[in-house]
Amino acid sequence: MEHVISMEEILGPFWELLPPPAPEPEREQPPVTGIVVGSVIDVAAAGHGDGDMMDQQHATEWTFERLLEEEALTTSTPPPVVVVPNSCCSGALNADRPPVMEEAVTMAPAAVSSAVVGDPMEYNAILRRKLEEDLEAFKMWRADSSVVTSDQRSQGSNNHTGGSSIRNNPVQNKLMNGEDPINNNHAQTAGLGVRLATSSSSRDPSPSDEDMDGEVEILGFKMPTEERVRKKESNRESARRSRYRKAAHLKELEDQVAQLKAENSCLLRRIAALNQKYNDANVDNRVLRADMETLRAKVKMGEDSLKRVIEMSSSVPSSMPISAPTPSSDAPVPPPPIRDSIVGYFSATAADDDASVGNGFLRLQAHQEPASMVVGGTLSATEMNRVAAATHCAGAMELIQTAMGSMPPTSASGSTPPPQIMSCWVQMGPYTWTCIRHCGFRDRWEHFICRRR
């Protein structure tokens, strides 16, 4: 059976109410083992019932109280010290708790007589006192281990877990070296308060612990220094400014993109309008080119016609020879040959017209029919009309040529006189007139045919 007794219960008034135990006969006591965990002492006994355990517990507690009273009478009041909880078991849980100030209980080394050693009660008291001294030594060792540098703690983080605490326990080292931890208790208790106060002050929670991510180590808190805090704030401020600059730059780029999109749409509209104008101009250009080619063809045709008329007018003879028919009475009289000239054109046009219609525009000199045309009889009406038309045209051409030949070439001042237009209208039939006009220049003849409807 195991029973757990705390330190507050040991120091409380509970022990004053217990009466001193009655002496009992000596008997074998099982070995008592004490286990220290934080501020709790575990006392276990094996091999006996509940009644024996209670009697043994009362006797042991009474003996321990008597020793404490003797120490209180022989020693002065010790200085206050700070009780630090075990950081290995509850480092992160007890970090926010303030340190508890308690009076340090010092134990004066007492001479253990042979009679006391022989008494099992005294033996139990000695064992309990040794456990208390081991507890204080363990606290001192924890205080010493808390003031090491961060590098040493990072290197030795694995040495404080598992069975490494047994190797680094100073109590066991002292026992192995032959030293008495009881005699060195008072000398070590003097500097315990200062070291514990220093270590506890370094473990006080700080408001900046929330800002430090991942700064908690295995053996305790690694508090940031002022330089690290300042550097962290500077980094945050620079990151904030960088985000502001990026946001402003992104806003400028978005504005530029919107402006470029507007300009692009405007340019696209202008390009569409220009393309439409280009297409219209291209169509108009093709139409104008077709019209120009048509006009060129017409001009060329007019020039060719005028040239042909001029050539025909220049080859007209002064008199048209008419061949006489054969003296056969039965054979019809063949028509006289018509030359390919303007006179022949005029005579062919007026072949079926009435010869009795006169020319009211220009008086022509009457010509008598040559005697060679009337041979062995009279001419037909068609032949007479053709001969009359040819005679009229030939006379008109002779008059125009005579008038043009009598014109002076130049004036008295040496300059060419203005051209004089001379024309001759010849009626070829009841509804047809022809005009031969000369403009005063060499080889510049114009021929017009007018028909009345």
UniProtKB/Swiss-Prot annotation:
The molecular function terms of the Gene Ontology recorded here are: DNA binding; DNA-binding transcription factor activity
bZIP domain: which residues? Answer: 225-288
**Compositional bias per record (Acidic residues), positions renumbered to this chain:** 207-216
Q: Give positions of region: Disordered.
A: 145-243
Write out the tissue specificity statement of the associated record.
Seed endosperm.
Q: Which domain of life is it from?
A: Eukaryota
Q: Which SUPFAM superfamilies match?
A: Leucine zipper domain
Quick one: where's region Leucine-zipper? 253-274
Compartments annotated for it: namely: Nucleus
The UniProt keywords, alphabetically, are: Activator, DNA-binding, Nucleus, Transcription, Transcription regulation
> Polar residues: which segments have biased composition?
146-175
Q: Which residue stretches belong to region Basic motif? A: 228-251
Cellular component per GO?
A: nucleus
Membership in a protein family? Belongs to the bZIP family.
Q: Which function does this protein serve?
A: Involved in the regulation of the endosperm-specific production of albumin b-32 and other zein proteins. It is a trans-acting transcriptional activator that binds to the consensus sequence 5'-GATGAYRTGR-3'.
Q: What is the protein named?
A: Regulatory protein opaque-2
Q: Which organism is it from?
A: Zea mays (Maize)
- Give the lineage: Eukaryota, Viridiplantae, Streptophyta, Embryophyta, Tracheophyta
